[in-house]
Amino acid sequence: MPAYKRVLLKLSGEALMGDDAFGINRSTIEGMVNDIAEIVRLGVQVAVVIGGGNIFRGVAGGAAGMDRATADYMGMLATMMNALALQDAMRHANIEGRVQSALRMDQVVEPYIRPRAIRQLEEGKVVIFAAGTGNPFFTTDTAAALRGSEIGAEIVLKATKVDGVYTADPKKDPSATRYTTISFDEAISRNLQVMDATAFALCRDQKLPIKVFSIQKPNALKRVIMGEDEGTLVHV
């Protein structure tokens, strides 16, 4: 029996690269879609916020001397490309994915309309939110916290390359241990980088828990959905 009925899955753009240095790795995205399909078949309503860092990162563009707002808009367009790739992979897996974008591009995707998104979720469709919040200076983590709050998700599932939040960087400190659960306040006091500060604060204020887990670990998403000991749960 799934532990959650409606979830917001945050996928980083980098996760779509697989072992490649850039772009979208088809086998990687197909594997992600198969994981998503499995939980959809359990009756879980799934919304996805996707990043664009595999194609372009607004922060990096700004740091290189580009106007930050322009760079962020370019990053939003990168998320649109990823969202369309994810939707296409879902079609091949016989799942109906609908892309809703915070930036209008009506010939390609639907605009973000909250009641429509909720209706599509209730119909068993996977809703993919593209273009972040539609505003520069806000990350796709913040978009995940915002959309998760708007659609009434029970939890934000932050899919990363590590299997949770650790006491220290496990790559640098072999003695680092994974937190099974941790409170928002404790994560702040220990300066643990779960999400960026704006996203983290929004989740805390809305009492929206976050589960950090590895998207690269086989069956991890299903284990999270079933309430098993996978990743790290950040709670109020």
Swiss-Prot record:
An MF annotation (GO) of this entry: UMP kinase activity
Xref: Gene3D superfamilies: Acetylglutamate kinase-like
InterPro entries referenced in this protein's UniProt entry, alphabetically: AceGlu_kinase-like_sf (IPR036393), Asp/Glu/Uridylate_kinase (IPR001048), Uridylate_kinase (IPR011817), Uridylate_kinase_bac (IPR015963)
Entry keywords, A to Z: ATP-binding, Cytoplasm, Kinase, Nucleotide-binding, Pyrimidine biosynthesis, Transferase
EC number: 2.7.4.22
Pfam entry (one): AA_kinase
Subcellular location field: Cytoplasm
Entry coiled-coil feature ranges: none
Top EC class of this enzyme: transferase
Binding site for ATP: K10, L11, S12, G13, G53, R57, T160, Y166, D169
Record entry for activity regulation: Inhibited by UTP.
GO terms under biological process: 'de novo' CTP biosynthetic process; UDP biosynthetic process
GO CC terms, sorted: cytosol
Organism domain of life: Bacteria
UniProt pathway: Pyrimidine metabolism; CTP biosynthesis via de novo pathway; UDP from UMP (UMPK route): step 1/1
Enzymatic reactions: UMP + ATP = UDP + ADP
List of residues binding UMP: G52, D72, T133, G134, N135, P136, F137, F138, T139, T140
Function noted in UniProt: Catalyzes the reversible phosphorylation of UMP to UDP.
Record text on subunit structure and interactions: Homohexamer.
Family designation: Belongs to the UMP kinase family.
UniProt-recorded name of the protein: Uridylate kinase
Gene, per the UniProt record: pyrH
